[in-house]
UniProtKB/Swiss-Prot annotation:
Organism lineage string: Eukaryota, Fungi, Dikarya, Ascomycota, Saccharomycotina
Protein known as: Uncharacterized protein YHL005C
Subcellular location: Membrane
Topology within the bilayer: Single-pass membrane protein
Any one cellular-component term (Gene Ontology): membrane
Keywords: Membrane, Transmembrane, Transmembrane helix
Transmembrane portions of the chain: 15-31
Length: 130
């Protein structure tokens, strides 16, 4: 089931502030993950960032965990860690000219989303229980 959701963001740049309009469309589905997750905590987000006349589109999967002891948590964190290593390597190689940091508050969870924008668009998600 698809539903539109509009959330309040704290959008900041590490170097300077950049005004942006961010729209989130949440999709409650298990179709985009290989892991078993209860449908109420499996969410896919589609982010569109419009800033200075340019629009960037980012799709990523977000899992909110109600029980940190669940076995799939370790595996998903491992995958996220592998992805983050690739992001850091490419950033250190100078392939990114922008580094945006975005914080979202959802219930008792804090999600840190680092969005790297250049010729390619990547997103690294690190979710931790507040």
């Amino acid at each position: 089931m698809r539903k539109e959701s509009f959330l309040t963001f704290y959008f900041s740049n590490h170097l300077y502030l950049c005004p942006a309009i961010i729209r989130l469309s949440s999709v409650c589905t298990l179709a985009r993950t290989d892991y078993y997750l209860p449908s109420n905590i499996a969410v896919t987000y589609d982010i569109q960032i419009s800033s200075l006349g340019f629009t960037y589109r980012i799709d990523f999967f977000l899992a909110l965990f109600s029980d940190p002891a669940r076995p799939f948590l370790t595996e998903i964190n491992r995958k996220i860690g592998q992805y983050a290593c690739v992001i850091r390597e490419r950033e250190q190689a100078g392939e990114y000219s922008f580094h945006y940091s975005l914080c979202i508050n959802i219930n008792v969870y804090i999600l840190h989303i680092h969005i790297y924008i250049d010729r390619y668009i990547y997103a690294y998600i690190n979710a931790q229980v507040q």
